[in-house]
Amino acid sequence: MKSKSSRTRVAILGSGSIGLDLMFKVKASEQFDLKFVVGRNANSDGLRLARSCNVETSSDGLDFLKAHEDAYDLVFDATSAAAHKVNNRFFSDAGKFVIDLTPAKVGRLCVPCINLDDMGAEQNVNLITCGGQASLPLAYALKQAVDEIDYLEVVSAIASRSAGIATRENIDEYMTTTEYALAKFSDAKKTKAILNINPAEPGVRMQTTLYAYARYRDFDRVRASVADMVEKVREYVPGYRLVVEPLESQGRITIGLTVRGRGDYLPEYAGNLDIINCAALAVASHRHATARLGATQ
């Protein structure tokens, strides 16, 4: 077991479902020393749970982290897009590395299986959206295998119980940021993102379908590129798998996937939250390894 002095000191800002699932993931890792879980409501279920897990908590939000800035090195921001834009002013001035789990689009966009190695010097890394983390690997794989993508549409369906207040408040930002990232990572001429919140009980597992109109010469190359990318995602999101292999019909390509959560805190059907948290851990682990390598040279 690593000593605490060799671990990266972590603060989690946001005590909702994403923040709590992150708490369990961080506590299970020997790379990190979880210092704080910070929220806004002292009586919230999230902060009560964190306290019961022997984690120091505060309901003073960003003010608490300002007052304790020497006690942590890395922040997971699991608040909202609007809040993150305010929060990052302090984190940037204080030289804190931030992993942004909101669709604020302030920092460098990251999908670990695509561009994790480019994140070494970034102060702020943005994880786009849950639908983005699910669909962008396939969009990028498609780009590698076709000549041109004229239109790209992504439809994600998630369980209502996995869509918290922040998710519902950020719907507009979700669409805008996902569509922007789809265009950036696929070079598609036009993109569209749709999010369906399914009220069915028991909760349904996250599913994402990608539709594309593209020009290609060898569809076997598309299949191979997608299959290779799925394996790369599964290295940090074990529950990621295709349910519809790439299909073609008159220039239209369809690919379907599902994400089963790891069940660290959230139900297995909440793959939409699990995938963005797994991506966050991948980024944090990369930064930890980079920092430790630099310290030994």
From Swiss-Prot:
Pfam family, one: Semialdhyde_dh
This protein's encoding gene: mhpF
HAMAP family according to UniProt: Ac_ald_DH_ac
Record's keyword annotation contains NAD: yes
Lineage: Bacteria, Pseudomonadati, Pseudomonadota, Betaproteobacteria, Burkholderiales
Signal sequence, start to end: none
EC number: 1.2.1.10
GO biological process: catabolic process
Reactions it catalyzes: acetaldehyde + NAD(+) + CoA = acetyl-CoA + NADH + H(+)
Enzyme's top EC category: oxidoreductase
Name of this protein: Acetaldehyde dehydrogenase
InterPro entries (alphabetical): Acetaldehyde_dehydrogenase, Acetylaldehyde_DH_C, NAD(P)-bd_dom_sf, Semialdehyde_DH_NAD-bd
Family: Belongs to the acetaldehyde dehydrogenase family.
Residues where NAD(+) binds: 15-18, 162-170, 272
Record organism: Burkholderia pseudomallei (strain K96243)
This protein's record includes keyword NAD: yes
Active site annotation, chain numbering: 130 (acyl-thioester intermediate)
MF-aspect GO terms: acetaldehyde dehydrogenase (acetylating) activity; NAD binding
Key words of the record: Aromatic hydrocarbons catabolism, NAD, Oxidoreductase
